[in-house]
């Protein structure tokens, strides 16, 4: 799994914390430091919005303005049973 993020993004930190807490391995890609990665996000999503997760080739934004981190969707997409 890849996580497209920036260092200054609070929502990116929350998404990575969720993954860490559930033992999900990922590769972080900083779109501020990698112009090709930034262009990749733009190509797939239509705008430079982070965080973006790529799970088995599928792009997913785990955050929505006004809703915060989409925990239910994360549990489902990652196959994590909810307590």
Name what the model sees in each region.
Residues 1-25:
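Local sequence-structure signature of Cys/Sec-based thiol-disulfide redox active-site neighborhoods
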Residues 10, 32, 61:
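Nucleotide phosphate-binding site architecture
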Residues 18, 42-43, 67-69:
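Non-catalytic interaction surface on structured domains
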Residues 23-38, 47:
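Thiol-based oxidoreductase modules, predominantly thioredoxin-like and allied folds used
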Residues 34, 41, 57:
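Positions that flank functional sites
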Residues 43-44, 80:
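Rhodanese-like catalytic fold shared by cysteine-dependent sulfurtransferases
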Residues 45-55:
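Structural micro-motif
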Residues 55-83:
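Non-catalytic, surface beta->alpha helical segment in thiol-disulfide oxidoreductase systems
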């Amino acid at each position: 799994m890849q996580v497209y993020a920036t260092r200054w993004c609070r929502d990116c930190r929350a998404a990575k914390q969720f993954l860490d807490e559930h033992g999900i391995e990922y590769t972080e890609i900083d779109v501020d430091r990698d112009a090709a990665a930034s262009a990749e996000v733009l190509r797939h999503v239509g705008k430079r919005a982070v965080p973006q997760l790529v799970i088995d080739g599928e792009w997913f934004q785990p955050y929505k303005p006004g809703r915060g981190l989409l925990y239910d969707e994360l549990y489902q997409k990652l196959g994590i049973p909810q307590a």
